């Protein structure tokens, strides 16, 4: 397996690092989530690390430079998450549900996508099941989210 893109999925962003606020939202299967954006290496590496909670209607959207196989891990992540992978067309191509927190540092396992992805959405664990998400679901972006 190629080296894990230290797109350390979930991490708690740097102050002022990621775009956030009421204008940055995504919609998935009729449910709107306020998202923080991680669109550079530093933001993707930090992700949701060191957070103790995330509001029910919030998440983090990781934007990669190109569509390719992705692998995320839970290093220093304290909350369980659903990791959802989307292609260039913003269609759901892979899901890692109910991924547990990991305190093993570099010993945390990877959670790879089953198909190439450009966008990764992290939500609180259980959201994918609650929405009954199936691959092919479309992710809609608010106008404030940057388009690569």
Please provide the spans of the model-predicted regions.
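Compact, glycine-rich, soluble single-domain proteins
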Residues: 19-148
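C-terminal motif of bacterial Sec signal peptides marking the signal peptidase cleavage site
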Residues: 15-17
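Sec-dependent signal peptide recognition
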Residues: 2-9
């Amino acid at each position: 397996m190629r080296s894990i893109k230290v797109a350390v999925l979930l991490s708690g962003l740097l102050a002022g690092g990621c775009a956030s606020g009421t204008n940055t939202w995504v919609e998935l299967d009729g449910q709107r989530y306020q998202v923080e954006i991680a669109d550079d290496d530093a933001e993707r590496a930090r992700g949701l690390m060191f957070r103790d909670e995330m509001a029910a209607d919030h998440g983090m959207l990781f934007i990669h430079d190109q569509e390719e196989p992705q692998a995320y891990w839970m290093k220093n992540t304290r909350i369980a998450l659903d990791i959802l992978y989307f292609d260039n067309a913003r269609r759901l191509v892979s899901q890692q549900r109910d991924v547990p927190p990991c305190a093993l540092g570099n010993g945390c396992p990877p959670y790879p996508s089953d198909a190439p992805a450009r966008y990764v959405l992290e939500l609180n664990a259980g959201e994918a099941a609650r929405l009954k998400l199936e691959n092919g679901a479309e992710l809609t972006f608010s106008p404030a989210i940057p388009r690569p």
